[in-house]
Amino acid sequence: MSFGASFVSFLNAMMTFEEEKMQLACDDLKTTEKLCESEEAGVIETIKNKIKKNVDARKSTPSMVDRLQRQIIIADCQVYLAVLSFVKQELSAYIKGGWILRKAWKIYNKCYVDINALQELHQKTLTEEPLSSDAANDNHIVAEGVTEEALSRLKGAVSFGYGLFHLCISMVPPNLLKIINLLGFPGDRLQGLSSLTYASESKDMKAPLATLALLWYHTVVRPFFALDGSDNKGGLDEAKAILLRKESAYPNSSLFMFFKGRIQRLECQINSALTSFHTALELAVDQREIQHVCLYEIGWCSMIELNFKDAFDSFERLKNESRWSQCYYAYLTAVCQGATGDVDGAQLIFKEVQKLFKRKNNQIEQFSVKKAERFRKQTPTRALCVLASIEVLYLWKALPNCSLPNLQRMSQACHEVDDSSVVGLKHLLLGAIHKCLGNSQDAVQFFQRAAKDESCRQNNSYVQPYACYELGCLLLDRAETVARGRTLLLQAKEDFSGYDFENRLHVRVHAALASLRELVPQ
C-alpha cells in the first residue's frame, strides 16, 4: 500500500513539476524505503542461513519472495528519488542523483541475477534434470516451494525498474557520461527496451506502466533527441504494434488515446492527431495533469498548422491553470498572440514572462526570459512573432511533422523578416525548412550562412553550434562528404559552450556520431 501511494505521489509530481508535490513525493518515497530497509538482507544468503538452521524450505518461500519484492521496491524508490533530483537541473543534484542510482543499480542487478537463478532452478526441478555445477548448491531446495507465477511476477517487477534504469542512463548527456561511468554502472538501450517489454507482458501491477514507458520512449524521446538521426519516424512501428496489442484492454484510456495522437502527429496526420488529443482531453475530465499534457499537444499541433488562434487558446489556458513553468507557457502564449496580429496584447504578456520566471536553473525558462526581454522593451511585429513560433517548432523537433504547404508558408514568412539582429536565426530556420522539403542543396547553403554569422552570438548564441550540427548531419548522407560531416559534428560539440539548450544538442550530436560508428566502424 505504501509503495502504491508513494508511486502515485511521484507520478503526480512528474506531471505537474509543482515544488510542493515534488517535496511530498520525496517524503513519501523515503518513508516507503524505510519500511522496506529492515528486509534488505541478500536473498540467497538469507536462504542459506535458513537451510543451515534446518528450517523447512517451503516455509521460507513466502519470506524469500517477500524479501525480493521489498528489495525491488527499495530500488524503485531510489530511481524515482534520483529522477526528482535530476529535474532540478543543478550540478549538485546530478551528483546526488548519480549516487542514489548507484545504490539502485546494485540492488536491481542482484535481484535480476537472483530471480533468473531461481527460475533456472525451478525449471530444472520440474524437469528433474541434474543441476549444473553453477547451480549445484543447497539453494535448489527452495525452488520446490516457489511457484512459477510468483517468479514470473517478480521478474516483471524487477524488469520495469531495471529496464527504465538502463534506458535513462543510456540517454544521459555525453558531458555527464564520465561521471556515470565513474559511478560504476552502464546504460544499455537494447537491454532497457527488452526488460520493459518483458515487464509490459508480465502479470505484475507495473505492467501497464511499462507499456506507457515504452510508448513514451518511442513517441517522445526518440524523435525529440533525434536518436534515429534523420529518420523522424523511427520507433513508430514499435509504438503502433504496442497500441494494437493493448488498445482493446484499455478502450477508454486517456493516456493510450494521447499516445495514439503522438503517433499520428509524427506521421504528419495533424488533423487526426488533434481529434485524438481532444478525445483524450474529454476522457481525462477528472485528471487535471493529463488534461494539461493534452492541451500542450493541441497547442503544438495548432502551431504546426499555423493556426495561431487555437494555439493561443491552449497555451493561455496552460499559463493560467498549470503551475509548471508558467513562464514558458506565457512566452508561447505571447508568441502565438503576436502571430495572430495582436501585437499590443502580445507585448503585455511578454512583460509577464520575467515576473513568472521562478526556476532559475531551468534552460527552457532561461530561454523564454531572454527571448521575451526584447519584446518587453519594444512592441513586437507580427513577422517577428511568426519567426519566433517557427523557432520553437525547430528547437522542439516539430518541423518534420509539418505538411509541405505549411513548410512553404513558413519559408515565405522567414524571407519576409527584415531585421539585421535575426539574420543568423533566419538562415538556420530556412535551412531546417528546406531540409524538411527535401531541398538539400538549399539547406546546405542556408546552414553555411548561419554557421558563419558571428552577429548571432549576442542574441541567439545557439545558432552557430546548431547550424554546424545540421550541416554535419546533411554531409553524412553522402559518402564523399562523411569526413567533413564528422568534423562539423565534433566542432558543434567542442567549439561552443554556454549557449541555449547545449545539453540537448550534445545528446543529438552523440546520437549522430554513434550512428556513424555503426555504419563505419572506427
Curated annotation (Swiss-Prot):
It comes from the Eukaryota. GO terms for biological process: cilium assembly; otolith morphogenesis. InterPro entries: Iml2/TPR_39, TPR-like_helical_dom_sf. TPR repeats lie at residues 254-287, 292-325, 424-457. Keywords: Repeat, TPR repeat. Belongs to the TTC39 family. This is Tetratricopeptide repeat protein 39C.
